[in-house]
Amino acid sequence: MRILFLAAIIALSTAAVLAQQPQKPTASEIYHKLEKLNFLGSALYVAAHPDDENTRLISYLANDMHAKTAYLSLTRGDGGQNLIGPEIRELLGVIRTQELLAARASDGGEQLFTRANDFGYSKHPDETLEIWNKDAVLSDVVRAIRTFKPDVIINRFNHRNPGSTHGHHTASAMLSFEAFDLVGDATKFPETAITHGSWQPKRLLFNTSWWFYGSKEKFEKADKSNLVSVETGNYYPALGLSNGEIASLSRSMHKSQGFGSTGTRGKQTEYLEFLKGEFPQDTTNIFDGINTSWSRIEGGVAIGKILNPLLDSFNFQDPSTIVPQLVEAYRLLKDTKQGHWRSIKLKELEELIVACSGVFLEAVANKESINPMGAYTLKVEAINRGANKITLSKITTASGLILSSKEIVLLSNEKENLELEVTSQNKVPSTAYWLKSKGTLGMYSAPKDLIGLPQTPAAEQISFTLNIDNTALQILKDVVYKFNDPVDGEVYRPFNVLPKVSASIAEKVLVFADENSQKVAVHVRAGKDNLEVTLQLNAPKGWVVSSPQLFTLERQGETSTLWFTVTPPKNQSQGYLRPLIQIGDTYYDKELINIDY
């Protein structure tokens, strides 16, 4: 038997709609953000896969405690099923990454990853850690903790029962348990200690339940003196939802796994077993003994005196009345020493000032994609829908290139539109950063500065400088593409950098039962207008492929199908078939995959 596999190098486009739509918070949502502003505490939830996370507890931490909350999923779920489409393995991991981001957008958490690959079911954590490369994944867990700097770490799974469940599950808990003692030691994984600083969380907890005890009856009889218990069924009037309803909305984002969930209301208790660190005196408070007030920042007491009273004086009819106090707090915070919470709260203050002011900023490209180093027209909309005096003083690219330095006073409810010509500095096409380089069965490869990020940063970003009450704010916005659909109305899409041309073969595996030739169709897509293209197929030694073909693609987006005759060798053989496109002296070998659900 003779077998050919398609060798595909991917340029990936995903319709990450949630990430592209502009935020337009209501007064109630602004109030909720204000509550979060005055809490300086954080929690990191750790498990193995997308859908392993306890969305009820994550939502409770983010919306009830108002803590900065993140879920560290060691893998992207590449080994799971797919209920909604044909994508599996790496492409399923891309889908499940977006599902996790949608879940966090629902429950208020953030999302982190390691480079570990979900290679399928594993019977034992020893097998898992061998395939993953334990030290590499452990270093990623340490990196995540040092970057996020959680006060509390919560494991989803039990680290003490290897072999009793999925090896990935137990391994995630084992790595978190080990990392807790390493992150505070700058000599352990020193590279991330230099970059992000060492850090020591206050406590490590295990999110236990009756399931881990074997039955509800056994759990009722168990000694609970080592457990923290929290009531997670609370109702949030500002959001109009109970915590269980938010959790179900989040859970239902795992659509590829068929995890749609119905909302619940009423009391729901979560239990957390104390594992390491400082035991809380108040076993109903996860953050007991942790300073979560503004005094956590040097000079923060004065800031807290300005911000804490704003919850009582907040005007739901006119949130802009608190803008002067927010700006005053922003100025004071800018004058404090560089630090972890300073950066977080400056960003939150910027978002609140913009939201309370009724400012809308948007940067829209005139086309959905460009080629590397390509040019596009940027359509800017800026409007101040409140009563505060605001000036738009500068617009730059994220790298600092000035696009407009014209000072524009944003008069109340008077829209300003600008058209700016931009040349991208992006030299490579958009794709999932963990798929750019070949990894192993257990580990993806990733640039060091991107390890842990949920997705590749936006291809193009624009910085707006706003001046409010003699205070400059830098507001960063992703460049997006949008259009009007006759059915859906305003539709947003990511703005991507795509190759000039791409090729694909629909059949990823070709089987030759004998020595007879087969016809192979290659689909070529133009990434720009007026291309003269030569296409050839590279095959392993001994295989014979018909001659390269020269053809023209006139319009961007145009697709042409070309047929090649492939003849196998007489003896058994297998290898990779690779489409290669030549334009002038440049060769292209990427396949463009668009995922849109």
Residue ranges and their predicted role:
Residues 21-22, 29, 182-360:
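The feature marks non-catalytic terminal segments
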Residues 372-387, 515-529:
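Short beta-strand elements of extracellular/lumenal beta-sandwich folds
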Residues 421-454, 553-556, 567-573:
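Short, surface-exposed loop/turn segments at beta-strand-coil junctions that are enriched for proline
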Residues 383-417, 421-426, 527, 531-556, ...:
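Proline-anchored loop/turn motifs at beta-strand termini and strand-loop-strand connectors
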Residues 330-373, 400, 482-513:
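Low-complexity, acidic Ser/Thr/Pro/Gly-rich terminal tails and inter-domain linkers that flank the onset
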Residues 20-189, 210-211:
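Active-site beta-strand->loop->alpha-helix modules in alpha/beta enzyme cores, enriched
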Residues 454-528, 595-597:
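Acidic, serine/threonine- and proline-rich intrinsically disordered appendage/tail regions
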